Each structure stands twice: as C-alpha cells, then as structure tokens.
Amino acid sequence: NTLDFEYAPIVLDGAKIVVTNSMVKHSLVTSAYNDRRNESAQALKDLQTVCDIKTLGDLTDEEFEAHKDAIKDEVARKRGKHAVYENQRTIKAVKALKENDIETFGKL
C-alpha cells in the first residue's frame, strides 16, 4: 500500500510488554526469502484475476478466504494467506491499542 504510518497510544495499566531480539542472523541472498517473495507475488497475480486489488494488503481475511481458490499453487496460497492475515492482525492491534484493550492486543 504505502509507507504511511501512525502512532498508536499505549495505556498499559500495569501490564508489561517484553520486546526481544533472538540475534539470529538472516541472509536475504542465501535464505529462501526470494522464493517466498516470488510465491507471494504469484498469489497476488492469481488473486488479481478475480479481485480488483493492487496488493495483498488490500484484502481482509474474509475476502481472502472467499477468493483463495484462484491461487492454484498451494505454497503460493499459503504465502498469500500469511501476508493478508498478518496485515489484518496489525490493523486489529492498532485498533486494540486505540481502545486501550491491552488484553486483546496481547492475544494478537
């Protein structure tokens, strides 16, 4: 979509958020990153035959489920689903933070 962003307020009310770094190094050259990117691109291309979308992020979970059969390759379907669901999870997380619903945020 875009590189636009917004800040979401956090009211913890005694809750704590733990942020960790596994320190695991990833190489985009030797990893399967390029394969996953190509599979995601194929999922988008297939979905565009039945949906008027520019990115996988244009779909809701429900829209993806309604049109997922347009993605012929099972692995590409899995990659597309991951992209759509993670985007929706982020949207839900921001909504939960704006509503001071730290419990829902934590479950996401």
Positions of predicted regions on the chain:
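C-terminal nucleotide
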Residues: 1-108
